[in-house]
Design a protein with these regions (language model features):
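Conserved proline-anchored active-site loop of SAM-dependent methyltransferases
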Residues: 82-100, 180, 308-322, 331-332, ...
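Extended, hydrophobic alpha-helical segments in both membrane/secreted and soluble proteins
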Residues: 150, 164, 176, 289-298, ...
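Nucleic acid-processing catalytic cores of prokaryotic defense/repair systems
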Residues: 45-66, 79, 85-90, 94-102, ...
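Accessory, often C-terminal, charged low-complexity segments
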Residues: 1-56, 61, 70, 77, ...
Length: 609
């Protein structure tokens, strides 16, 4: 449950004006749930307890936060932390599911044999399966409600000289532009930037879509911008140079040896290549953006030591570039894959930072979309039911009461996390009246609740038909989903030797994949490409970390190896051409060992010597 609610606005009058603007925006866009989002914003930002889980490098103000945008902003606001530049790359409402390719690592014994034979494995030979990261499937109303609440939260933690870049594409950008005008003010709209690239669709029936859109807004008229940091080099002829000289946008570079190179003020159309498969910056994250894109934004719109924030951090490109350019950073994301990818990326870059977890009551199973899938399998008897609306996750059959509709909050939509008067009113006055008359009971799962007695009193006073509403805590189900991986090891001299590693969750996933492959073989024929895991299971390990500082509390990675998909290791942030040999060395006595499996689950074990 939230510790308290932090007001979005210092001045209630200003806050009400913004909300009144939102009412007008809703009327223009003609979509629903106006009162719902208005009441949530009037209530304030939900502030939860936080836990620092790891410190990397020296003591630093840099943060990696696992949690939702709104909850992260509540933490920043409560601690008087203001950000000077925001870049966000939120879901585009594209209707697509995004997946992570999970590669089975090489068994150390096999990898060593390959090394001795001086052979190389091609990437195509690697065995892998996919896991969902998140679903970008929204209806327009839900997306805009969610986006409005996030943008209001972000604005509340921006400094007076801050600006924000929001990265979108053709699916929803025209609607979000109207929200941005209302939240930040039409007068604070600065640019519509076109990022043009060659990657993408190849069709002949219409113009090919080859760009994304970035909207730039400022918090006030006193925003920071330095065009000299991002001047563009262009070649021009001597005759043109003499004719233009200091006129227009051209700025002559007087340094010797430049030849016909000139520098020009940047425009709002950017030709920046997407990341190719062999790029050194590539981190195998499906929505990764190029560092060159963020470099241009951060150089122009911030100065050294300013705080750069990305509340949908993804691959960690914003934090990485901010650190490279001498800025402070805040990276926030709800998915464990984002947190781990960014953490590893920044460690390789030599950055110092804290990793924090927002304790919002949800013990996520890797990420929201996988948690939703897991929940459906854990609610006994839950199945899809055509006779109930999509508000309900489905229904269960009760031997006495018959069909019982079940509501489950959508973990990908933060507005459904809290069971409050707004949500239960929606259940009573919108969802229940649409149910068939023979329905006698509904089940409402919740993650967080304002006050159970208050909710039950509201139900008694407002429920207009004879139907039972049962409230259930979703956390009781989620607590059953986490099963620690099993590790066996022994210590010899200054090395820990991994004997075996068992991850029931991954084994189950691999078995599901193999069954799918067998089914395809029956239908299509051909060779069955099943995944087999050795008895030791070492190929299921992605990273090993030793804490030689403390046996509890905040993690300190004193020794660390990460195994890439080809079997090579990165040792304490430094890439090598060595295969993993099934061991990890230490200098100081290790107190704890952390193992990350190839799907991103981490388990910590106390070392007994």
């Amino acid at each position: 449950m939230a510790v308290k609610y932090v007001p979005y606005f210092k001045d209630a009058i200003q806050g009400q004006a913004l909300l009144d603007n939102f009412v007008r925006t809703k009327r223009i866009l003609k979509y629903a749930d106006n009162n719902e989002i208005k009441e949530r914003i009037e209530r304030g930002l939900p502030l939860y307890e936080t836990e620092v889980t790891e410190i990397v490098g020296k003591e630093s103000d840099n943060l990696i936060i696992r949690g939702e945008c709104v909850s992260a902003c509540a933490y920043l606001k409560e601690n008087n932390i203001k950000v000077d530049l925001v870049y966000i790359d939120p879901p585009f409402a594209s209707g697509a599911d995004y997946a992570k390719t999970v590669y089975i690592r090489r068994n150390p014994k096999i990898a060593e044999a390959i090394k001795k034979a001086e052979e190389k494995f091609e990437i195509e030979e690697l065995k892998s399966f996919e896991e969902k990261m998140y679903g970008d499937i929204w209806n327009k109303e839900a997306y805009l409600n969610w986006m409005y609440e996030n943008l209001m939260a972000i604005k509340s933690v921006m400094s007076e000289t801050a600006s924000i870049y929001i990265h979108l594409d053709w699916h929803i950008c025209h609607y979000v532009k109207i929200l941005m005008d209302e939240i930040f003010g039409e007068d604070n709209f600065l640019n519509e930037i076109i990022w043009s690239y060659s990657w993408g669709s190849r069709i002949e029936t219409q113009w090919n879509k080859k760009h994304d859109t970035l909207y730039m807004y400022s918090k006030s008229e006193k925003f920071y911008f330095d065009a000299k940091e991002v001047l563009e080099e262009r070649k021009i002829s001597e005759s043109t140079k003499n004719r233009l000289k200091y006129k227009g946008a051209m700025i002559t570079d007087r340094n010797k040896g430049r030849g016909d190179q000139e520098k020009a003020l940047p425009t709002d159309v950017w030709y920046i290549a997407t990341i190719n498969g062999m790029a050194t910056e590539k981190v195998d994250y499906s929505t990764q953006k190029p560092e060159a894109l963020l470099e241009r934004i951060i150089k122009a719109s911030s100065d050294s030591n300013m705080i750069i924030a990305d509340f949908f951090g993804g691959s960690g490109v914003t934090a990485k570039v901010a650190n490279d350019l001498g800025r402070k950073f805040i990276h926030c994301d709800i998915g464990i894959n984002s947190i781990e990818t960014t953490r590893d990326r920044l460690k390789r870059a030599g950055a110092s930072f804290k990793v924090m977890d927002i304790k919002d009551g949800v013990n996520l199973y890797r990420n929201p979309v996988q948690t939703m899938d897991k929940i459906k399998s854990l609610i006994s008897g839950l199945k899809n039911e055509d006779s109930v609306s999509e508000f309900w996750e489905g229904a269960v059959n009760d031997s006495k009461l018959g069909l019982v509709p079940v509501y489950v909050p959508n973990l990908m939509d933060s507005t459904t996390k809290l069971l409050d008067i707004v949500l239960i009113n929606k259940v009573i006055n919108l969802a229940i009246p649409e149910l068939p008359d023979e329905i006698k009971k509904v089940i409402i799962y919740y993650i967080d609740i304002i006050d159970k007695k208050e909710i039950n009193d509201f139900i008694k006073e407002n429920l207009g038909r004879e139907i039972e509403i049962e409230l259930r805590d979703l956390k009781e189900i989620l607590s059953e989903t986490v099963i620690d991986d099993i590790l066996e090891y022994h210590i010899l001299d200054n090395e820990i030797i991994i004997d075996s590693f068992i991850s029931e969750r991954i084994i189950k996933k691999i078995n599901e994949y193999n069954e799918k492959m067998k089914a395809q073989f029956i239908v299509k024929g051909g060779k069955i490409k099943c995944i087999e895991i050795s008895e030791e299971g070492l190929e299921l390990i992605e990273m090993i970390s030793l804490d030689c500082t403390s046996d509890k509390g905040i993690w300190h990675s004193d020794e660390e190896i990460k195994i890439d998909k080809l079997g090579y290791i990165t040792e304490n942030g430094v890439k090598t051409k060595n295969f993993w040999n099934g061991k990890i060395k230490f200098v100081k006595k290790p107190l704890r060992i952390k193992i990350r499996n190839i799907s991103g689950d981490e388990s910590i074990h106390i070392i007994e010597i």
